[in-house]
Amino acid sequence: MDMLTWAALSADEQKTALQRSPLIGDSGLEQSVRAIVDAVASRGDAAIKEFNQKFDGARLANISSANSDNLRLSEHEIEAASARVSPELKAAIAQAMANIDVFHSAQQFRPIDIETQAGVRCELRSEPIEKVGLYIPGGSAPLISTVLMLALPATIAGCEQRVLVSPPPINDAIVYAANVCGITEIYQVGGAQAIAALAFGTETIPSVDKIFGPGNRYVTEAKRLVSQDGRCTVSIDMPAGPSEVLVIADSDANAQFIAADLLSQAEHGPDSQVILVTDSLPLAQAVNQALKSQLAALPRQEIAATALKGSRTILVKDMQEAALVSNRYGPEHLIIQTRFPREVLNNIRAAGSVFLGAYTPESVGDYASGTNHVLPTYGYSRAVSSLSLADFSRRFTVQELSAKGLLGLGQAVMTLASNELLDAHKNAVAVRLASLKG
């Protein structure tokens, strides 16, 4: 990776050093996705089946003829798919589920009920989102962990209807993971058409209140479009971008560990970005050597090598400056491999998820430590939080005033309303005060 010295860079050069690769897209993307969304909104299941055949035709041929035209998996199909999953994988899923359950169950909302002044009672309450849609991408590698990260919190939160969609044929492990997480509605549909179905509903697929899950640029664009479409009322989880990691390391860090962590993100895709920030030139050089040897053994070495071309090492004077660089970048994943990692953590202000110490690879958070791996990317961690139980609920406030409360607060409200030239607001208080004063 290219090596830069932070203190030697101008302000503009520092900004360039922390730039990400441009998001891949084309001028026709919105038009293409909008056509799919509109077709599903107007023609429902018929459009879904046409797009399934068009985009997933080869894979549809692998589905049993008895169900090749059915969008929803039957209870029998769910049981059969689950039976084909190996005991070893089931055990791994169970261990990951247990940790995710513990961490997310601890996030249960605690209501606030307080008197702000005499006779003025204010509350903050929370209720689960009634209907949620979970999108799980297809492809050669089943994203089992993503099912756990979405389905389990939705179940813990108490969402009444939990719908999962994934391109056909859905991998057995995906079906099993969904089932053990309490998902009983599983539909064979992927891509932009799946997002549109969740937003508008079809004859078979119910509309939902919020859509979660990663996907390719068509899925990402569809999520953006439906969240802004006046024909439906649906929200989405968070903006999506390429995967990324920033590693803060000092001279005590293990170069082999760091190289492995960098490559574990680089192999996600050619637009992934990895950054090493260190105050040790010998360590930086050792990491570069370790990258070369480990890269040669990777099946996805071409993808990882392309990602490394857009990545870099940044040399800093100390760990305080390292934290400053990290905060300006706002990484999706932040790994801190230093002698005193928690001291560095105290200076961190922006990160999707943080991994402390030599024995905490980013992979554990991806799969089974208990934290959620759905994280803000592309610098959004400076303002957007990682996925949590709160994302599957909505909060609302309650206020209740007694007569004494209104007498004590009314004049302030009327004064503010008058200054904002909102006389009806003022009058709503005035008529009540008049009735109290007889």
Curated annotation (Swiss-Prot):
Binds 1 zinc ion per subunit. Keywords: Amino-acid biosynthesis, Histidine biosynthesis, Metal-binding, NAD, Oxidoreductase, Zinc. Pathway: Amino-acid biosynthesis; L-histidine biosynthesis; L-histidine from 5-phospho-alpha-D-ribose 1-diphosphate: step 9/9. Zn(2+) binds at residues 265, 268, 366, 425. PROSITE patterns: HISOL_DEHYDROGENASE. NAD(+) binds at residues 135, 193, 216. It catalyses: L-histidinol + 2 NAD(+) + H2O = L-histidine + 2 NADH + 3 H(+). Gene3D superfamilies: 1.20.5.1300, Nitrogenase molybdenum iron protein domain. The keyword Membrane does not apply. GO terms for molecular function: histidinol dehydrogenase activity; NAD binding; zinc ion binding. Transmembrane segments: none annotated. It comes from the Bacteria. The active site is at 332 (proton acceptor), 333 (proton acceptor). GO terms for cellular component: cytoplasm; cytosol. Its EC number is 1.1.1.23. One of its GO terms (biological process) is L-histidine biosynthetic process. It is an enzyme of class 1 (oxidoreductase). InterPro entries: Ald_DH/histidinol_DH (IPR016161), Histidinol_DH_CS (IPR001692), Histidinol_DH_monofunct (IPR022695), Hstdl_DH (IPR012131). PANTHER family: HISTIDINE BIOSYNTHESIS TRIFUNCTIONAL PROTEIN, HISTIDINOL DEHYDROGENASE HDH. Belongs to the histidinol dehydrogenase family. Catalyzes the sequential NAD-dependent oxidations of L-histidinol to L-histidinaldehyde and then to L-histidine. This is Histidinol dehydrogenase. The gene is hisD.
